[in-house]
Amino acid sequence: MYENTNSEENNNNIQSQNMDIQKFKKYIRTEKKADERPKVIVMGRSNVGKSTFVKLVTGKNVRVGKKPGVTLKITEYDMGTYILVDLPGFGFMEGIEKKAQEKIKDEIIHYVEDNKDAIAASIHILDAKSFIDIVERWGNKGEVPIDLEMADFLEELELNPIFVVNKMDKIKNSEWDNHLDKVSETLGFLPPWRQWLDNFVPAIMRDNYGIDGIKHRINKRINIFKKSKK
């Protein structure tokens, strides 16, 4: 009796292909779901405490250094409900040529532009004391420091940055409000700074001061972001 073995083989091949297609579709769905998670970017001039912040938030053993330029690549951390993105430090970096510094700046800009629709929150960390000093020094030369360039860049993309004013232990307690007023005004926010609590967080990273406030603002931004996508 003649058996149609070719037909059976074809059926097996079709079933195998269907299984492969289902696996591929499942893979695509998984990847799509991961890609759809909101991103929280962290940026700042080298040596402002960015790596310390990432270490505190992630619990990971992030390398923390005293010299500028510890973080030289874009690193993503899986936080479950969102992805934390540690961007390289910008500005002066000891031992790094100016050409390389410009390349890092370009990489940051390209990453943010390419992912702006997925960014739920942007954290811009500043050194409380040196930020004002740098702005004044560059201003005297008629130039705009990279700190303000990046702040304006985030505003242009409507990413509504959260400015973490770190190393507030360098400022006398009695002068905190006046100093933060100056920082906020320099960044284009009309004083007093306390009317912009969603945008400014005074912090002392090494003492874990301000971390809870930052996390609260991140979660708030993520919730708003998710609602906007529904």
Swiss-Prot record:
Binding site for Mg(2+): S51, T71
BP GO annotations: cell division
Domain of life: Archaea
Cofactor dependency: Mg(2+)
Annotated keywords: Cell cycle, Cell division, GTP-binding, Magnesium, Metal-binding, Nucleotide-binding, Septation
CDD domains cross-referenced by the UniProt entry: YihA_EngB
InterPro entries cross-referenced by the UniProt entry: G_ENGB_dom, GTP-bd, GTP-bd_ribosome_bio_YsxC, P-loop_NTPase
PROSITE patterns: G_ENGB (PS51706)
Function as written in the Swiss-Prot or TrEMBL entry: Necessary for normal cell division and for the maintenance of normal septation.
NCBIfam families: PRK04213.1
Protein name: Probable GTP-binding protein EngB
